[in-house]
């Protein structure tokens, strides 16, 4: 219900929406990481919006599990995926007990997951996220099949200039 409420609130201000079913520090979201839940979320979402929807998927241990999740998204028009969220970390020293590791160390995993998903689903729109910290890495992901990129940690450490560096490099 909360997802639908937010879609109704924000759809007039967006050109697309991301539904994050994989935040590692939100315990209840794990229940959505299966094909039936994804199908249900998308079915209900399509009743209230025609905006493109991107489902942000978790970083999974068994790469073949992406097949099941992505097949559920393909039953709906204008649905893509975001690969992938942070790497889940559980540690009692964290104030909430769990969270997600981000940054450069995730890049190789992101690239592997992207290559697998692109080969299995050549038509799906893929936004790629995870460990992108240089123009070369951005180019590698785009050449491997990402349609667009999301950059978080590099933006924090490098500032907005990283976006300009990546864009300048890609335009050459």
Spans of model-derived segments:
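Glycine/Thr-rich beta-alpha phosphate-binding loop at enzyme active sites
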Residues: 21-33, 66-122, 158
């Amino acid at each position: 219900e909360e997802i639908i409420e937010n879609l109704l609130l924000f759809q007039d201000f967006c050109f697309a929406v991301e539904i994050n079913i994989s935040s590692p520090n939100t315990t209840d979201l794990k229940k959505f990481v299966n094909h039936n839940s994804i199908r249900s979320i998308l079915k209900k979402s399509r009743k209230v919006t025609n905006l493109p929807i991107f489902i942000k998927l978790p970083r999974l241990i068994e790469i073949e599990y992406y097949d099941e999740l992505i097949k559920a998204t393909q039953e709906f028009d204008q649905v893509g995926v975001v690969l992938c969220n942070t790497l889940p970390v559980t540690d009692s020293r964290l104030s909430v007990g769990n969270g997600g590791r981000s940054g450069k160390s995730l890049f190789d995993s992101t690239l592997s997951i992207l290559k697998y998903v692109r080969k299995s689903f050549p038509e799906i729109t893929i936004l790629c996220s995870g460990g992108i910290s240089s123009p070369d890495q951005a180019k590698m992901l785009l050449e491997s099949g990402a349609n667009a990129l999301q950059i978080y940690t590099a933006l924090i450490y490098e500032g907005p200039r990283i976006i300009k560096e990546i864009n300048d490099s890609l335009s050459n």
